């Protein structure tokens, strides 16, 4: 241990001691964990201690501290990690135990709202280790470290083991592990290094009775941690050494701490996680996290106002059959369709939730739930306001959002053929509408224009096909605001009257929320009025300028984002939202901006799919808690074909998870939005995630941002010099990464001889990254001979199995050299057309280029006209044959546009088009800005 100078003891556990130490070689502080001296002679505990270090070293996740080095030479047994400043969760909980009065700061830190994101991060880490086949077996507040900068990490992997490892049985045999009867169970808060693996207080009942550990034993420990977060106390605290009679009932969190205002559903989650019977617990950590999602997303508390029966006429003001086409022509599939029509007698306010269930047969015929304003409904104008139309066909459920009789949004998803009923939940809260079917989010819509009192309207053919309708209202929604009067004018489109009252309220309440809210709504009023009159929308910006520096400052940027959105200035819209989030991250109005981001994501999925990727990235970075598990699956499916077209996703076979650094990098690559790359680079560097670092350098090179590339390269050189571990894989991979980066730098500078020297010294996978980047540069710069030689060298040194990865580049070279014979042989042998080519694949485009080289223009047009997706990249490439306008590319995301320009240029070269034609695409490619903002 000569390299390390121990500074002070940080903590002591069942097997080890953790010290703050100074690393003399790297001149930095580290955390050094060594086996306790009184246990160092025990070979089994030494083995378990080293196993702990190796398991932690194999796991790469933000919630796990990476391992720098492991030493087991001679008597010294220790390993080192980054030192994270902070405190344990136990320390935080202990600071409030049995205290009746808390400081404001401590009350905020230990609130249920503050604890939930921390608990979700803990669960995310446990979900990750379970996916890797690892059980922690000693989860407790003492082993949760809360960093000063928001880090939440799980430490102490001494009890961790692989789920199906033989060591489970060996532990029983070697430690004399015996079956503990219920009467012999005692409790303590320290890990027992001998008979029992884990901390008894946090062990599941079956573990204390001798059963093997499982995912459900970790879930039990998570449940206890959640219970403590909710109640600030332990569910069955006993004096040390006292037995726990399981017959005693455990109080629910609500009963244990009624003053904490714990939502009943959250209390139920904790109780389910700590059920004595493992069968009654959550089946997985993923299921536990899914149950937490509504609470993480900040859903309101609702109370039941009324339950309406569709069979009781007393609930309804109108109750009669109607011809659907008369009132809702957009919905009727046949002009002769008659439906039962019901309009509620009761009026609901602006915050309402409607819940019911409908049969599959009813949905096949179509079911409508509408919210017409009372004034229009009383006049028989039932189509006014918002409504939802539910329909299904061919095992696909569709939900349409209707406004004033016009469909403005439609979402569809597949359904299980055997499903007989659907549970519907519609929430209208102020200016936001969310629609769930079987807890799956279908619609999220925000309208900044206020709505007045509304009624409930039901349209259905068979009354037997719908359950009773539960009407819930948000607690506190009945409070009347001084803004209600101008809101009413705005809802009636009386813009001048609304503006006059908003100004009056703004001036009457200086410094208060009513003032800045009135100014924001004044801006929305003027923006709507200008838009309706066909004026210059940018005039509305000055109204939002008045919010600058006020107590409602973030709303300045939200308002400007609305102006830019309606004006079609997407980049400026994003810039405005980012300014608000960067300048006021803790402002009370920031959740409002996060809601707006979510709305824009779902809205762009429906209207501007290229914009959706940017909003996905922003939400992942800023508000990942807003995306539920089901939405993650939906978005992954949406991104699937782009994933197949992304080199680093094909090389690195690790599954692309939605909430991951790899997904953030993936979206940065496709959008050209590189703002978050420095943080991703730092994260990958700190975790020693070499694959991520490789991918990041590839993305930076593809973006063309030489300044960022140079900065990352300098940081990498320093980082690799600091890492000096004898016989370590880190050294080898670090050296390979440095050579790879030097090769990319040489390619950027057109120093091809040096590039070849560096790239030839790295593994084939890294060569493939360089080859892909070089191919774009070589064909655009018309330096194909150099690229061809580079390609041939890599091909000659690669294995037969790896040859398939360079076929696309070989075909490109053959086409460029007009070698029809070789191009045809390579295409027909490796990508035969009769096997069905995927239209977004590279091979599909190359076949089109081959046909172009034969001179058969009509065959080329026929080839690209086969594309099923008329606005997909391959279909758009075919447009360059007859059209020199680049307007049709505007709907593409950044990388799609860049790639389409390259392939269009290549196709026109193969088609022997005049130089001035293909030069248009070449220059457009070269002139593309190297980042999202330019």
From Swiss-Prot:
Keyword ATP-binding listed: yes
Regions crossing the membrane: none
Protein known as: Serine/threonine-protein kinase PknD
Naturally occurring in which organism (per UniProt): Chlamydia muridarum (strain MoPn / Nigg)
EC number(s) given by UniProt: 2.7.11.1
HAMAP family referenced in this protein's UniProt entry, alphabetically: PknD_kinase (MF_01957)
One Pfam family linked to the record: Pkinase
Record's function text: Together with the serine/threonine kinase Pkn1, may play a role in the specific interactions with host proteins during intracellular growth.
Catalysed reaction equations from the record: L-seryl-[protein] + ATP = O-phospho-L-seryl-[protein] + ADP + H(+); L-threonyl-[protein] + ATP = O-phospho-L-threonyl-[protein] + ADP + H(+)
Keyword terms, alphabetized: ATP-binding, Kinase, Nucleotide-binding, Phosphoprotein, Serine/threonine-protein kinase, Transferase
């Amino acid at each position: 241990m000569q390299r390390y100078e121990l500074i002070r003891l940080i903590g002591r556990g069942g097997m080890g001691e953790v010290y703050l130490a100074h690393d003399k070689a790297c001149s930095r502080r580290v955390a050094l964990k060594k086996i306790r001296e009184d246990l160092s002679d025990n070979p089994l505990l030494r083995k378990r201690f080293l196993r702990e270090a190796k398991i932690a070293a194999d796991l790469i996740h933000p919630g796990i501290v990476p391992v720098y080095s492991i030493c087991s030479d001679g008597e010294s047994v220790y390993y080192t990690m980054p030192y994270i400043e902070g405190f344990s969760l136990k320390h935080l909980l202990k600071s409030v135990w049995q205290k009746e009065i808390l400081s404001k700061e401590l009350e905020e830190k230990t609130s249920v709202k503050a604890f939930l994101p921390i608990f979700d991060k803990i669960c995310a880490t446990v979900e990750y280790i379970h996916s890797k086949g690892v059980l922690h077996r000693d989860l407790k507040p003492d082993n949760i470290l809360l960093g000063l900068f928001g880090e939440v990490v799980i430490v102490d992997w001494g009890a961790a083991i692989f789920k199906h490892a033989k060591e489970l049985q060996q532990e029983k045999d070697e430690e004399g592990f015996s079956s503990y009867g219920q009467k012999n169970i005692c409790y303590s808060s320290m890990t027992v290094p001998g008979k029992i693996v884990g901390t008894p207080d946090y062990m599941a009942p079956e573990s204390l009775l001798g059963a093997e550990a499982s995912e459900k034993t970790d879930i039990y420990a998570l449940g206890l941690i959640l219970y403590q977060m909710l109640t600030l106390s332990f569910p069955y605290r006993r004096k040390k050494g006292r037995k726990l009679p399981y017959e005693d009932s455990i109080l629910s969190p609500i009963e244990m701490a009624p003053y904490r205002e714990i939502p009943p559903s959250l209390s139920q989650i904790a109780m389910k996680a700590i059920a004595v019977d493992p069968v009654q617990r959550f089946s997985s950590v993923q299921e536990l996290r899914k149950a937490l999602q509504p609470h993480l997303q900040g859903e309101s508390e609702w109370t039941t106002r009324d339950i309406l029966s569709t069979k009781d006429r007393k609930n309804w003001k109108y109750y009669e059959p109607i011809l659907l086409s008369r009132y809702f022509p957009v919905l009727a599939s046949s002009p002769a369709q008659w439906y039962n029509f019901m309009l509620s007698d009761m009026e609901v306010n602006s915050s309402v939730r409607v819940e019911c269930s409908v049969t599959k047969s009813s949905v096949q015929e179509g079911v409508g739930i509408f919210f017409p304003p009372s004034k229009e409904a009383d006049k028989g104008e039932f189509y006014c306001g918002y409504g939802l139309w539910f329909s299904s066909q061919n095992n696909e459920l569709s939900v349409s959002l209707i406004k004033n009789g016009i469909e403005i949004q439609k979402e569809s998803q597949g359904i299980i053929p055997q499903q007989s009923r659907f549970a519907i939940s519609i929430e209208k809260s102020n200016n936001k509408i969310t629609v769930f079917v079987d807890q799956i989010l279908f619609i999220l819509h925000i309208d900044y224009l206020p709505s007045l009192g509304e009624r409930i309207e039901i349209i259905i053919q068979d009354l037997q096909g719908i359950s009773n309708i539960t009407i819930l209202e948000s607690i506190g929604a009945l409070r009347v605001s001084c803004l209600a009067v101008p809101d009413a004018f705005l809802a009636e489109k009386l813009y001048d009257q609304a503006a006059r009252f908003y100004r009056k309220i703004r001036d009457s309440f200086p410094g208060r929320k009513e003032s800045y809210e009135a100014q924001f709504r004044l801006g929305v009023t003027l923006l709507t009025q200008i838009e309706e009159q066909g004026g210059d929308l940018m005039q509305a910006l000055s109204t939002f300028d008045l919010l600058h520096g006020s107590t409602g400052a973030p709303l300045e940027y939200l308002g400007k984002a609305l102006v830019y959105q309606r004006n079609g200035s997407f980049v400026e819209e994003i810039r405005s939202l980012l300014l608000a989030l960067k300048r006021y991250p803790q402002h009370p109005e920031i959740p409002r901006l996060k809601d707006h981001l979510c709305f824009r994501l779902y809205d762009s999925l429906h209207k501007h799919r290229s914009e959706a990727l940017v909003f996905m990235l922003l939400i992942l970075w800023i508000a990942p808690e807003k995306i539920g598990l089901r939405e993650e699956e939906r978005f992954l499916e949406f991104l699937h074909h782009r994933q197949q077209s992304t080199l680093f996703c094909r090389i690195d076979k690790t599954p692309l998870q939605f909430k991951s650094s790899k997904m953030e990098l993936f979206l940065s690559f496709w959008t050209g939005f590189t703002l978050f790359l420095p943080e991703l680079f730092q994260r990958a560097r700190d975790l020693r995630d070499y694959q991520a670092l490789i991918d990041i350098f590839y993305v930076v090179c593809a973006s063309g941002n030489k300044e960022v590339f140079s900065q990352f390269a300098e940081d990498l050189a320093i980082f690799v010099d600091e890492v000096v571990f004898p016989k370590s894989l880190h050294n080898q991979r670090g050296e390979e990464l440095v050579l790879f980066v030097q090769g990319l730098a040489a390619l950027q500078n057109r120093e091809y001889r040096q590039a070849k020297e560096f790239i030839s010294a790295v593994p084939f996978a890294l060569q493939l990254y360089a080859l892909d980047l070089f191919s774009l540069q070589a064909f655009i710069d018309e330096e194909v001979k150099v690229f061809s030689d580079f390609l041939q060298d890599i091909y000659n040194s690669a294995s037969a199995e790896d040859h398939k990865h360079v076929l696309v580049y070989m075909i490109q070279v053959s086409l460029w050299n007009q070698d029809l014979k070789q191009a045809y042989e390579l295409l027909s042998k490796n990508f035969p057309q009769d096997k069905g080519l995927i239209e977004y694949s590279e091979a599909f485009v190359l076949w089109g280029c081959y046909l172009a080289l034969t001179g058969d223009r009509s065959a080329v047009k026929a080839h690209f006209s086969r594309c099923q997706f008329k606005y997909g990249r391959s279909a758009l490439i075919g447009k360059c044959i007859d059209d020199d306008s680049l307007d049709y590319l505007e709907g593409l995301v950044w990388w799609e546009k860049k790639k389409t320009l390259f392939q269009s240029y290549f196709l026109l070269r193969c088609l022997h088009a005049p130089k001035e034609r293909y030069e248009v695409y070449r220059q457009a490619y070269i002139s593309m800005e190297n980042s999202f903002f330019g």
